Amino acid sequence: MAKTLYQKLFDAHVVYEAEGETPILYINRHLIHEVTSPQAFDGLRVAGRQVRQVSKTFGTMDHSISTQVRDVNKLEGQAKIQVLELDKNCKATGISLFDMNTKEQGIVHVMGPEQGLTLPGMTIVCGDSHTATHGAFGALAFGIGTSEVEHVLATQTLKQARAKSMKVEVRGKVNPGITAKDIVLAIIGKTTMAGGTGHVVEFCGEAIRDLSMEGRMTVCNMAIEFGAKAGLVAPDETTFEYLKGRPHAPKGKDWDDAVAYWKTLKSDEDAQFDTVVVLEAKDIAPQVTWGTNPGQVIGIDQLVPNPAEMTDPVTKASAEKALAYIGLEPNTDLKNVPVDQVFIGSCTNSRIEDLRAAAAVMKGRKKADNVKRVLVVPGSGLVKEQAEKEGLDKIFLAAGAEWRNPGCSMCLGMNDDRLGEWERCASTSNRNFEGRQGRNGRTHLVSPAMAAAAAVFGKFVDIRNVSLN
């Protein structure tokens, strides 16, 4: 029977499946951070259990840490408690931890691939909803809750029901100036934020194949934003080239054997998908969200929709509520909308490719006077090191931006990087929910180049009309 890539990955990891019961999957890699792991370790201690496979678990600090200081003693409140707990728990169990004293520390979904911890064919879990990022390597990766974190620590397995299979094909080549972020926002705009519910999505087509691994990670990162359980891209030479020589990637004959296996990880030609979505790459414009979920998105050359013209009552009510919160009128041209802050970072867009794209826009230009703050936050210490080696930090600083240390930063209001009330932000992150970046903050999701352009022009502009340096 022909199988999709998802079905192959799932079936290869079933440990036990009784008739009428949820299958139990083996988990190859478990990534943890300071926010969703403390209660799980507490649960292990209460039950008198050990971490079953320490060598398959890796930790980092990212969500609640400061991007301004690297000293845990200078953290405050809950953030300090969480970081100290993670450090204590990893030391007590022998789990490898990339803490703030190491250059390998970073956002969990940046650090994992960088270290070669993310490999094709794996099952990967983390107590974080954007674990789908790792699916860019042809791994079955998804977020789990804290009770499931405890279960994986104790058993290295997880009960998991089978999902439906969805294929999203992006045909042809994108036009100049169009990025992975624009592709995935356009996909979400077409499917809506619930279009992938109950599915694992495989992204394919020429436009996806043309993406770097950084770009593929951006696309898979946001699979959750249209309701999917996980996102996948079948591994190919781009994948292998990225992974070769990474610290935890196979070496020597093991590498050759691994690549031979990885080349089998693709959907069979006659595999049947439950849902198929097709986009033409040439039709994708630079994307900007106008509302309070990633599916409320338009091309920069379009006007904000008018709820009065929407026929579905639920969609109409959602749009009316979103526009009231975001402070926009129907039929507004977003190119006339000024921004207060700009955030370039997050597990969606904080890799070296993203920073290069932003720097190309900001080089030789200055932050607009109406923009209060521009935060540029690399996704890991290694990304920061590479950016500084290339002089990107100097470009950002000369433009009036702040160059920070690695962390989740302003993606979420969980640390000291936040929007002020009713401030409007051009953000490269993945969620524009109400209050996501701070109480009553207004978030517009864009690509790194679009965010950088908003920083120097003080408003949203069409990046296709901006000269790059």
UniProtKB/Swiss-Prot annotation:
It comes from the Bacteria. One of its GO terms (molecular function) is 3-isopropylmalate dehydratase activity. It is an enzyme of class 4 (lyase). Its EC number is 4.2.1.33. One of its GO terms (biological process) is L-leucine biosynthetic process. CDD domains: IPMI (cd01583). Gene3D superfamilies: Aconitase, domain 3. Its cofactor is [4Fe-4S] cluster. It catalyses: (2R,3S)-3-isopropylmalate = (2S)-2-isopropylmalate. Binds 1 [4Fe-4S] cluster per subunit. [4Fe-4S] cluster binds at residues 347, 408, 411. SUPFAM superfamilies: Aconitase iron-sulfur domain (SSF53732). It holds the Pfam family Aconitase. The keyword Iron-sulfur applies. Catalyzes the isomerization between 2-isopropylmalate and 3-isopropylmalate, via the formation of 2-isopropylmaleate. Belongs to the aconitase/IPM isomerase family. LeuC type 1 subfamily. This is 3-isopropylmalate dehydratase large subunit 2.
